[in-house]
């Protein structure tokens, strides 16, 4: 399941994020590459000691935490701290790869990566190329969203960022463990959640069918959730 979400960041949040990033330095993106990705990853990343990284992470996580569509799609249980990358100049692409299944958490231990997300911080007009191409059972899709918008997709998907041939592509990316590890089950729950939302708007919260279907949604979540 691939879901795009417009305007995750408010205009004020986007402006603040871009201001902080403009004042930051970049290092090689190899610092977070796994064994396979190491050979295909050629970008830049904010280092862990970057002055503005904590503020940027709080900004992104705060925006995602208040977004109901993000919650419905990802059903996040544990969200790892976000990273920030840039594609420009000679560091301009990331070939096809799959994200590592297990990610080291800052506090220690490992988190299973079920869901990946990218929040775009550059507008499409600011760079050429740089398409996030995601291939999975739902087909192959190219994603290039306006700044402040996000895409959410299974971490098991094979994906790439095509070469940026002009300008600079800046984005935030992150991994999370979902309450529901199976992508097909998450898709069913998401579809049911969206259908229930439409049904409530049509017939109201107190409708008997709405009450019963809402109960079915939560019972399926109870059945499938790891938490």
Swiss-Prot record:
Asked if the keyword Metal-binding belongs to this entry, the reply reads yes
Q: Which residues bind Fe cation?
A: 97, 99, 159
Q: Select a single GO molecular function from the record's annotations and give it.
A: iron ion binding
User: Which residues take part in binding 2-oxoglutarate?
Assistant: 169
A Gene Ontology annotation in the biological process aspect, one of them, is:
DNA damage response
Query: What protein name does the entry list?
Result: PKHD-type hydroxylase azo0608
Q: Which Pfam families match?
A: 2OG-FeII_Oxy_3 (PF13640), PKHD_C (PF18331)
Q: Which domain of life is it from?
A: Bacteria
Instruction: Write the Enzyme Commission number(s) for this entry.
Output: 1.14.11.-
Matching InterPro entries: Oxoglu/Fe-dep_dioxygenase_dom, PKHD_C, PKHD_hydroxylase, Pro_4_hyd_alph, Pro_4_hyd_alph_FE2OG_OXY
Organism placement in taxonomy: Bacteria, Pseudomonadati, Pseudomonadota, Betaproteobacteria, Rhodocyclales
CC cofactor note? Binds 1 Fe(2+) ion per subunit.
Ranges of residues in domain Fe2OG dioxygenase: 78-178
Q: Which UniProt keywords apply?
A: Dioxygenase, Iron, Metal-binding, Oxidoreductase, Vitamin C
Record organism: Azoarcus sp. (strain BH72)
Q: Which cofactor does it need?
A: Fe(2+); L-ascorbate
């Amino acid at each position: 399941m691939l879901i795009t979400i417009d305007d995750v960041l408010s205009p004020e949040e986007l402006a603040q994020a871009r201001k902080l990033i403009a004042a930051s330095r970049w290092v090689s993106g190899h610092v977070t590459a796994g064994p396979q990705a190491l050979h295909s990853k050629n970008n830049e990343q904010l280092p862990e000691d970057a002055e503005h990284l904590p503020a940027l992470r709080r900004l992104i996580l705060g925006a995602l935490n208040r977004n109901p569509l993000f919650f419905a799609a990802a059903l996040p249980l544990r969200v790892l701290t976000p990273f920030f990358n840039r594609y420009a100049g000679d560091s301009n692409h990331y070939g096809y790869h799959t994200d590592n299944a297990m990610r080291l958490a800052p506090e220690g231990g490992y988190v299973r990566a079920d869901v990946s997300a990218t929040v775009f911080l550059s507008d499409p007009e600011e760079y050429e190329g740089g398409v996030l191409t995601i291939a999975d059972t739902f087909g192959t899709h190219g994603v290039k969203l306006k700044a402040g918008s996000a895409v959410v997709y299974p971490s098991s998907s094979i994906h790439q960022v095509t070469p940026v041939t002009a300008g600079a592509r800046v984005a935030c990316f992150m991994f999370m463990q979902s309450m529901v590890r199976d992508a097909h089950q998450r898709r069913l729950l998401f579809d049911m959640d969206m259908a229930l939302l439409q049904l409530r708007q049509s017939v109201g919260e107190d409708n008997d069918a709405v009450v019963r279907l809402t109960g079915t949604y939560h019972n399926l979540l109870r059945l499938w959730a790891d938490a």
